[in-house]
Structures are given as C-alpha cells and as structure tokens.
C-alpha cells in the first residue's frame, strides 16, 4: 500500500487511455520512471530494455490521497535474513523503502503496529513524525505478533481489535464526511474483537530460523539510521488491559516508561502513574538478559543445523542411516 501510494503521488492516475493494452503499457513505463529515481539493479535495467520502457516526464497533475491505513508494515521480502534483502536491493532490483517520510500529498495516515513479533526480519517500518505539526500521522502499538495485528490467523479476535480501531479512524463523523460501513459487518468487528484473544508465536515451527530479536519500541521510535523520530509512542488501550486483566500471561518488555495511551473510542483510563511506569520499565530490564541468551541460542541452533546438513558431505553413512566415520 505504501509503495502504491508513493507511485500514485509521483505518477498520478492515468485515465486518458485508449484500451487495456495502452493502459498496461503506460502503467509499466510510468512505474519504470518512478523507479528511475533510485539506483537500479541489473535485472531492472534488462527488464526496461526488453519492454522498451523509457522514462516518462513527471506529470503536472497529481491527486491528493485522502487516507492510508496500514497494518504492521515490515521490511520483509521472503528473505529470512536482512542482509539478503539488502543484497537483492543493491544488485537486482530496489524493493526496500527509500525513506521514512510520508508524502505531503497524503492528508491522513494510520499505522497499526505489532508489539510482540520476535523476528528481526519483520521489524516495522515506521513513518517519521518529526516536523509533523498535526495529527496527520497516527501510529499505534497493539498486542500480538505481525498477523495478530494485521490478520491472517483463523482465530482472529485479537486482530479485530486493530481492525476496529482502523475502521473507526475512517468512519464518517458527520454526513458526507468519511466512510459509511454496512452496519451488520461493522457491528461484528466490535462484538468479536477481544483484547484477551489468543496470541500466536511468530517463530513457531520452521519460522524459528528467522533471526530472534524482540521489538524494542524505544529504539524503533528513535532510529537515526532509518530517519525515524517519534517523541512519544502511542500504546493502544488493549495492550494495557491485557496486562491488567491477567486473564492470560502477558508481560511485554517493550513498552517504554513514557508513552501515550490510545483508545478506539472515548478517553483511555490511566493505567499507571509516571513513577509507576518508570519503575515497571526498570524492573523489566532484567528480562533483557534472557533475551540476550535466547539470541545466543538462536545462533547455536543455526550453526548446529548447518553442521548437520553439511555432515552429509564429510561423513560416511551406511544405507540404514548409521554413520561409520569420515568420508
């Protein structure tokens, strides 16, 4: 969605086409022109030669984008290791976001972000909020892993919490402003959402080979390398209700001492004083030792797996699977 928005703000919407073939050709050429702004890899150069796409002049009329709503935008493109995505981006074709700024043509943008995903490759790509004088950008952290926030699991009551919040941001406050939803469907989002719903494991099964690194909200919101500055993270009420309710074990280490509570509707209650928040944050620092050792165990798992796979080539195996020595 964010790439599409960047493309539309650059190339506009081409409506003066003769037929579908003309529309397809212009779309390819405009996209090639959009990509020309960045350093391109060898594959994209060959593609442009084969399709005979030449850079088009930047259009003079570009539409505003009224609203962008995204769920846990991440910089993951199939590759389980970040370095592979960087290599692909540099040598083959640019796929990573070039910067963290929201285009001025976008009037409002909302981003629902996962608190609990533990895969380093799935680190969130935040919008930079420095220099923003209004609430044009609203980025809120929700309980659950990547697909618990964005949806995708069959047990989805937790993801409906983020969906309910996002829909609320787009609803019409008065007649002829905002979106109007089918009432029965809209009511289902509210009634079936549950901030005590089941949370999934982002690294279960083969996903355990994704690099282990729980999200650190403070670091993510103050990332100079990514050009992101967010003074006070917004935490959705559901995360704090989930902790307070104790209906299930939930004690995220990522929530900082200084944050703002956001509710889907109405005002959020106060869950802790500033002094209590600071004390909680300091107490949870002890969990950082466990995170450190779990990261060490991840690399031990990776090395042992590589050793097991490579043993097929330097050890002598009998047909029944018994190792009889070096090859």
Report each predicted region and the residues it spans.
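Active-site- or binding-pocket-proximal scaffold segments within functional domains
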Residues: 1-327
């Amino acid at each position: 969605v964010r790439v599409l928005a960047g493309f539309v703000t650059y190339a506009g919407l081409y409506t003066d086409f003769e037929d579908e073939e003309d529309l397809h050709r212009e779309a390819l050429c405009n996209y090639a022109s959009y990509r020309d702004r960045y350093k391109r890899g060898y594959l994209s150069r060959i593609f442009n030669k084969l399709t005979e796409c030449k850079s088009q002049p930047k259009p003079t009329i570009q539409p505003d984008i009224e609203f962008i709503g995204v769920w846990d935008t991440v910089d993951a493109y199939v590759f389980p290791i970040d370095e592979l995505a960087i290599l692909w981006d540099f040598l083959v074709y640019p796929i990573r976001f070039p910067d963290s700024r929201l285009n001025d043509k976008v009037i409002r943008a909302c981003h629902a972000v996962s608190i609990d995903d533990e895969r380093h490759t799935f680190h969130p790509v935040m919008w930079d909020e420095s220099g923003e004088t209004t609430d044009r950008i609203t980025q809120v952290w929700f309980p659950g892993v990547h697909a618990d926030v964005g949806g995708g699991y069959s047990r989805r009551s937790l993801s409906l919490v983020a969906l309910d919040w996002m829909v609320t941001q787009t609803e019409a406050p008065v007649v002829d402003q905002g979106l109007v939803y089918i009432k029965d469907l809209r009511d289902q989002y509210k009634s079936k959402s549950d901030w005590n719903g089941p949370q999934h494991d982002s690294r279960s099964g083969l996903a355990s080979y994704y690099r282990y690194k729980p999200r650190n909200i403070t670091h993510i919101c103050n990332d100079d390398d990514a050009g992101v500055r967010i003074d006070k993270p917004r935490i959705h009420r559901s995360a704090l209700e989930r902790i307070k309710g104790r209906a299930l074990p939930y004690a995220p280490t990522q929530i900082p001492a200084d944050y703002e509570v956001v509710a889907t509707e109405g005002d959020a209650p106060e869950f802790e004083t500033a002094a209590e928040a600071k004390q909680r944050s300091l107490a949870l620092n002890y969990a950082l030792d466990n995170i450190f050792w779990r990261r060490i165990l991840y690399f031990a798992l990776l090395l042992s797996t590589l050793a097991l796979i490579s043993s097929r080539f330097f050890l002598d195996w009998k047909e029944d699977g018994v190792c009889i020595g070096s090859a």
